[in-house]
């Protein structure tokens, strides 16, 4: 007799993951650990995490093994027209769509909320940006060290070290990724919102 082990509370939830580096992949890693069916979209070159950290096999670094676990990978180059139809079919069957692309680039790729919600009106759209979707900083890059500096964390850390320094961890990305995963889970309840925007600057 075989006993089927439950996959977790998010079993049956399909997540389309168009994220990269740390923040987004950490968020969707948590969703996968909760049992969600996470489909990770990668470019033909592969996600940057495939080349981050030690690796015994090319493209299978420690970064990929950690943040890519409990996920299925598919290659789409959304800059070419041929990828659009299969991408839209995926969206039409999804419960959650997550990305961490700046607003202007997201609009160019036609993955903004207005476009995605037309394909699946009840989809939970989670956009993790550095400084929000509007305002003077909306399209500025938001790597972890920039957010640590802009939020004052580097200055606070300097009170201990004697001069401003970055916390020795990708603190902003991990904190925001954790918050975003929690917000997505809350949004899966019918009474919650379906359009989530989480600027990293407010999470640290």
Which residues fall in each region the model found?
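N-terminal helix-loop segment corresponding to the beta1-alpha1 unit
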Residues: 1-190, 195
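Single conserved hydrophobic/aromatic residue that forms the stacking wall/gate
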Residues: 195-204
């Amino acid at each position: 007799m075989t006993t089927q082990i439950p996959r977790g509370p998010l079993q049956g939830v399909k997540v389309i993951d168009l994220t990269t580096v740390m923040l987004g992949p950490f968020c969707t890693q948590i969703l996968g650990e909760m049992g969600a069916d996470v489909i990770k979209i990668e470019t033909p070159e592969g996600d940057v995490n495939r080349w981050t950290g030690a690796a015994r096999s090319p493209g299978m670094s420690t970064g990929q093994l950690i943040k890519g676990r409990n996920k299925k990978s598919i290659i789409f180059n959304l800059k070419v027209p041929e990828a659009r139809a299969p991408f839209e079919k995926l969206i039409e069957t999804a419960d959650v769509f997550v990305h961490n692309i700046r607003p202007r680039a997201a609009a160019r790729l036609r993955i903004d909320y207005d476009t995605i919600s037309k394909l699946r009106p009840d989809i939970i759209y989670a956009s993790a940006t550095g400084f929000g979707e509007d305002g003077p900083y909306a399209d500025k890059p938001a790597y972890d060290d920039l957010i640590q500096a802009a939020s004052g964390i580097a200055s606070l850390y300097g009170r201990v070290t004697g001069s401003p320094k970055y916390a020795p961890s990708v603190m902003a990305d991990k904190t925001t990724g954790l918050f975003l995963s929690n917000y997505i889970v809350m949004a899966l309840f019918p009474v919650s919102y379906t359009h989530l925007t989480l600027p990293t600057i407010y999470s640290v």
